[in-house]
Amino acid sequence: MKWWKLSGQILLLFCFAWTGEWIAKQAHLPIPGSIIGIFLLLISLKFNLVKKEWIQDGADFLLKELILFFIPSAVAVIRYKDTLSQYGIDLILIIMISTLCVTLVTGLLTELLLKRKGSVQ
């Protein structure tokens, strides 16, 4: 019975993802459908259209098995080793610079929001 419950919960999560993909495609949005699906799930949870218990076990299972979702990326790295050998240093620099930018902007925004929140109190 547990597998049926788990399968149903995962199916419900995928329904949100598929709905988000459909909305993104139909509306020609530049936002990934999976992000729209997560937002739809958030709204559904916030307004109690979907209860946390309905998806908890399925979400926990997917998080535990998250490493399986990275296997295709690892295979792609191996498959395109010629491209990586040609542009590898450039890609590493781009990844490092973009990570640094994201970290700095996140830190600055966090400080700004904390200062603003502190001044309100």
UniProtKB/Swiss-Prot annotation:
Membrane-protein topology: Multi-pass membrane protein
Any one annotated GO CC term: plasma membrane
Keywords: Cell membrane, Cytolysis, Membrane, Transmembrane, Transmembrane helix
Principal subcellular localization: membrane
Pfam family, one: LrgA
Gene Ontology BP annotations: cytolysis; killing of cells of another organism; programmed cell death
Keyword Transport among record annotations: no
Organism domain of life: Bacteria
Subcellular location(s) of the protein: Cell membrane
Cell membrane is among the record's keywords: yes
Residue intervals passing through the bilayer: 7-24, 28-50, 62-79, 92-114
NCBIfam families given in the database record: PRK01658.1
Family recorded in the similarity comment: Belongs to the CidA/LrgA family. CidA subfamily.
Function statement: Increases the activity of extracellular murein hydrolases possibly by mediating their export via hole formation. Inhibited by the antiholin-like proteins LrgAB. In an unstressed cell, the LrgAB products probably inhibit the function of the CidA protein. When a cell is stressed by the addition of antibiotics or by other factors in the environment, CidA possibly oligomerizes within the bacterial cell membrane, creating lesions that disrupt the proton motive force, which in turn results in loss of cell viability.
Protein name: Holin-like protein CidA 1
Taxonomic lineage from the root: Bacteria, Bacillati, Bacillota, Bacilli, Bacillales
Gene encoding the protein: cidA1
